[in-house]
């Protein structure tokens, strides 16, 4: 009954936090032998973490940098790098999202910021409007893979792994996804007879590189300090905010004090929504733990088959399905504790497992029917969800191929953390 409450509320389009919270509250109140005071205590304790402070600060840093005009600088640099290739602006969209990912770990922020600029340009270059939107939607999902990644932070806290190691684990898959998307953009360009209208110029590249340096320095400050042992990810996030304010006020001079209340409000809302979802998902996850659901899932799956390859495929299928239906933060908090016993039985490294989980869930961002970036894309690109769904499936297939590579070639995710000593 308590699970049915969440399912019914989701079917009626209720916010995911309300669905999870109502289900957990019903269990605490009427089903389980649990003191009701445990519910608010669980909500508070689940987000009362110094590490979790990194999330609102990274969101704020990304919003500040976007308001400072660095998005246009990164797009200009991307044009100078790959604009001369066939299907150039498709490649530019991918590269720009990869750059933007280093200052904002949010796919939604990347989709809105890059998409609003690139979709009209892609149309002018000869891409169909729905195709242009699909490229921007799919490439925006590189954001949560490349550090600093908000989903990786949530997974690290939930599974008890190193945030620094998880950041590194997502970097190589993010680059691979970018390259795969660029190959598909080349195919689309040849199919639609889109020719390169720009020529590569080292002088222009150098000029745009210098112009973009203020944005490119930010990930160096964040990641250099973390891996150099100078500060924690949370401290890195606060330094990123300070740097973004300095850049916006004194370097680009596009950030005005009158903009600050709206930026702070938007960042607070985005952070609060995520934290509320995490808190409610934790309350529900603890019920699942009390009922020994994680052990039951592991036992049932291993009883179904002992073949590791089949189990990993089933795991990917489950995560992809969940990613299509649920908020990423809620999915991580709810399902990671349930799946950890199975991961341990399969002998998976927790960093590798974390990359598997987050990448499958990220693919759900642009997978019909309810991928969150699909709806951001329809708003930014001014297309219907039906038009976007028709062109998005090849991108979903590319994402699934990446998930399988990450699953069955652990070195893709573990090579960089191992090299850095994690």
List the model feature ranges, each with a label.
Residues 1-422:
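Alpha-helical transmembrane segments of multi-pass membrane transport proteins
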């Amino acid at each position: 009954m308590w699970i049915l409450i969440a399912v019914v509320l989701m079917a009626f389009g209720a916010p995911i936090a309300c669905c999870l919270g109502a289900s957990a509250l019903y269990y605490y109140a009427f089903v389980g032998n649990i003191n009701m005071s445990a519910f608010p205590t669980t909500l508070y304790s689940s987000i009362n973490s110094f590490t979790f402070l990194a999330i609102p600060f990274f969101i704020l840093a990304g919003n500040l940098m976007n308001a400072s005009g660095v998005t246009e600088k990164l797009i200009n640099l991307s044009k100078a790098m790959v604009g001369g290739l066939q299907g150039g602006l498709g490649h530019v969209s991918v590269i720009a999202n990869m750059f933007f990912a280093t200052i904002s770990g949010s796919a939604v922020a990347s989709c809105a910021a890059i998409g609003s600029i690139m979709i009209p340009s892609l149309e002018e270059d000869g891409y169909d409007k729905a195709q242009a939107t699909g490229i921007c939607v799919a490439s925006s999902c590189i954001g949560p893979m490349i550090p600093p990644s908000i989903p990786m932070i949530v997974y690290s806290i939930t599974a008890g792994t190193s945030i620094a190691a998880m950041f590194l684990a997502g970097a190589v898959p993010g680059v691979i996804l970018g390259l795969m998307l660029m190959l598909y953009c080349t195919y689309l360009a040849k199919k639609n007879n889109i020719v390169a209208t720009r020529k590569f110029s080292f002088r222009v590249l150098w000029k745009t590189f210098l112009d973009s340096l203020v944005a490119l320095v930010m990930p160096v400050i964040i990641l250099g300090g973390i891996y150099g042992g100078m500060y924690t990810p949370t401290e890195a996030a606060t330094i990123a905010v300070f740097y973004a304010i300095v850049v916006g006020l004194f370097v680009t001079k596009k950030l005005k004090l009158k903009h600050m209340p709206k930026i702070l409000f938007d960042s607070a809302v985005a952070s609060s929504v995520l934290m509320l979802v995490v808190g409610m998902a934790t309350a529900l996850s603890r019920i699942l733990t009390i009922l020994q659901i994680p052990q039951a899932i592991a036992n049932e799956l291993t009883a179904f088959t002992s073949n590791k390859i089949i189990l990993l495929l089933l795991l990917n299928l489950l995560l992809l399905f969940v990613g299509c239906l649920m908020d990423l933060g809620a999915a991580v908090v709810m399902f990671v504790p349930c799946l950890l016993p199975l991961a341990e039985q399969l002998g998976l490294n927790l960093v590798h497992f974390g990359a598997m989980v987050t990448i499958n869930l990220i693919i759900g961002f642009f997978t019909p029917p309810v991928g969150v970036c699909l709806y951001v894309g329809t708003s930014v690109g001014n297309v219907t969800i039906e038009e976007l769904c028709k062109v998005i499936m090849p991108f979903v297939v590319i994402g699934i191929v990446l998930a399988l590579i990450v699953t069955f070639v652990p070195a893709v995710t573990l090579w960089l953390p191992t090299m850095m000593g994690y």
